[in-house]
UniProtKB/Swiss-Prot annotation:
InterPro entries: FAD-bd_PCMH, FAD-bd_PCMH-like_sf, FAD-bd_PCMH_sub1, FAD-bd_PCMH_sub2, MurB, MurB_C, MurB_C_sf, Oxid_FAD_bind_N. Its main location: cytoplasm. GO terms for biological process: cell division; cell wall organization; peptidoglycan biosynthetic process; regulation of cell shape. The lineage of its organism: Bacteria, Pseudomonadati, Pseudomonadota, Gammaproteobacteria, Legionellales. It is an enzyme of class 1 (oxidoreductase). Its EC number is 1.3.1.98. This is UDP-N-acetylenolpyruvoylglucosamine reductase. Belongs to the MurB family. It is found in: Cytoplasm. GO terms for cellular component: cytosol. Cell wall formation. Keywords: Cell cycle, Cell division, Cell shape, Cell wall biogenesis/degradation, Cytoplasm, FAD, Flavoprotein, NADP, Oxidoreductase, Peptidoglycan synthesis. Its cofactor is FAD. GO terms for molecular function: FAD binding; UDP-N-acetylmuramate dehydrogenase activity.
Amino acid sequence: MDKENFTRLRGELFCDHPLARYTSWRVGGKAERFYRPADLFDLQDFLTQLPSDEPLTWLGLGSNVLIRDGGIKGTVILTLNRLKELSVVNSQLAFREKSGTEDFFSGNGKTIIRAEAGVTCAKLAKFCVSQGLEDGAFFAGIPGTVGGALAMNAGAFGGETWRTVIGVETMNHQGEILKRTPDEFKIHYRQVEGLENQFFIAGYFCFNHGDPDKAKTAINALLKKRNLSQPIGKYSCGSVFRNPPGDYAARLIESAGLKGKSIGSAEVSEKHANFILNKGNASAADIEALIHYVAQHVSQIHGIQLVKEVHIIGRS
């Protein structure tokens, strides 16, 4: 499908579009089609004009994904700074009837925030501070968007996304928006089941009121801790592997002697062993090969099979 096949679009549609610049690893091939919607309503218009069997891939900050060098079949939709609405919502409108969780809406010192999928978690954390909501500070440590955080139950510094969620909006392939509650999903550590060929487009988050100064202090402390322990400013995806029960992936990788291990220009970080860096000219194939090497070596040394946190997509 070419651009002339679409009407009424206010966003930007590209064909055969390079994707590396949209990922934090700065690697990956091209998308057959790439769409940057103007907003949520424009996205709906776009989806209604796509064939029902068109493969869809959703991309936010590109921080938890490895796109293979052969690129992606179908259409890639960029949500970052496109689905960007962020606001305190009227408690009377947010899931009262469907959820049955009256305690969320009774005042009770709580505030409900609606954040669309393309809002960065860092921006959500800062918004929480502006509202004096101390328990949203952990979002500052998640290097991604709200959509990605919802899709994988992202977490940082002891906080997890779905502990704060009271409802979500999803969109299906036809552009229809559905409101759903947490009990419709199976929530696990870094995994969410039950999306059923839909995509998260917004989340409703419930936070406790607190001291704004304490909230700001909490974020600054978390960011300082992250900067000391992680290779911030380098081309990476964040954590590559999930932490196994009762242990840490970084400890297992480091104790296996893999810090500094490289394949091509992909390298296990010397600062944090659960980070793989693109030293400048790595291919997606280099990074994927190093991921497999690390997992295999840790399994041989420790007898523990690490599970990938990063999503690997596209064609080789």
